[in-house]
Structures are given as structure tokens and as C-alpha cells.
């Protein structure tokens, strides 16, 4: 049984849970109708996205909308002209492409929930890896089993409350 647990952790390293299409649909929907951002932002912030380019796009959308400005492929163009990651995906054409994934507000919220769910699963994997690291590297009893459990409980509680855990567990 312990070998099976280690294999699960090894496999988690290979492919973290994500849904790139859901991320594209959320961002594309906001780029078509900025009003959707008001609903989606209740569920998501930049750290919920998996794809680093989507993180940057969503971050820029947040900045523009918070200033009362329009966020669409044209207004985002200047923010990403020199971004190598976006260039690899096709540059401004990528921003236009993901608007084709745009949906209704209801569907965008459903997709935002999927993005949130994938984020929670990635965070659970991080917590599991932290517990494994703490338990296996502190064999000299620097940290007691009870302390490791308390840290894990706090991390899980933080995740349940806010959708992310305090990275200090890993320190």
C-alpha cells in the first residue's frame, strides 16, 4: 500500500489537474462581455489559473476593468506585444481565438467553477507533497507527528476557507 501511495505522488508530478479549455472559455467570455467579470471575479483570482499566459491575461483584465477601462483583444494588445509566451501561442490572434470560446454568463460561471475545482485539486496535491516531505525528512523528531498533523489541518482549513493554503507549511 505505501508503494501505491508513492506512485500516486509520482504521477501527480507528471500532470497536475487543469482544464485549459475552461480557462479559455472564462477569459474569452470576459473579453467579449466585461460584465461577466463581476460574476467570475467572485470565484476566481489570478492564482486559480494554471496556464501562466492565462494568469497574465486575467491579471491584465483585472487591472483594466478595475480602472473602468474596456478589456478586449484590442485593448490588451499593447500589454502583450513583447510577451514571448503569448507570441508562441500566436500573439493577438490567440486573444481573438479565445473569444470564440465565449459563452453566456451562466456558462462562464460554470467554467469558472471548473477552473476553481482544478485549482483546489492542485493545492491538495501540494499539501500532500508537503506532508510527505515533512514526515519523511524529519525522522530525527525535530517536528513531531502531531505538529505535522496540525500544519496539515491548518493548510486544509485554509484551502477550504479561501481556496488556497498558506505556503508557510512548506518552510
Where are these regions (language model features)?
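Active-site phosphate-binding and catalytic loops of NTP-dependent enzymes
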Residues: 65-69, 162-167
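Helix N-terminus capping/helix-initiation residues
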Residues: 72, 91, 144, 170-171
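The Walker A/P-loop phosphate-binding site
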Residues: 28, 165-171
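Extended, charged alpha-helical coiled-coil/arm scaffolds that mediate oligomerization and mechanical coupling
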Residues: 51-52, 81, 92-165
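Noncatalytic partner-interaction/assembly domains of nucleic-acid and motor enzyme complexes
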Residues: 1-120
Amino acid at each position: 500500500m505505501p508503494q501505491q501511495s508513492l506512485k500516486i505522488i509520482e504521477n501527480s508530478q507528471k500532470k497536475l489537474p487543469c482544464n485549459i479549455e475552461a480557462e479559455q472559455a472564462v477569459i474569452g467570455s470576459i473579453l467579449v462581455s466585461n460584465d461577466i467579470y463581476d460574476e467570475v471575479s467572485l470565484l476566481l483570482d489570478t492564482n486559480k489559473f494554471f496556464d501562466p499566459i492565462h494568469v497574465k491575461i486575467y491579471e491584465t483584465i483585472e487591472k483594466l476593468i478595475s480602472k473602468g477601462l474596456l478589456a478586449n483583444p484590442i485593448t490588451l494588445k499593447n500589454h502583450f506585444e513583447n510577451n514571448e509566451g503569448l507570441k508562441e501561442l500566436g500573439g493577438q490572434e490567440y486573444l481573438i481565438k479565445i473569444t470564440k470560446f465565449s459563452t453566456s454568463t451562466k456558462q462562464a460561471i460554470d467554467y469558472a467553477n471548473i477552473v476553481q475545482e482544478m485549482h483546489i485539486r492542485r493545492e491538495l496535491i501540494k499539501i500532500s507533497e508537503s506532508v510527505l516531505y515533512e514526515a519523511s525528512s524529519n525522522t530525527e523528531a525535530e517536528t513531531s507527528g502531531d505538529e505535522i498533523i496540525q500544519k496539515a489541518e491548518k493548510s486544509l482549513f485554509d484551502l477550504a476557507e479561501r481556496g488556497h493554503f498558506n505556503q508557510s507549511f512548506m518552510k
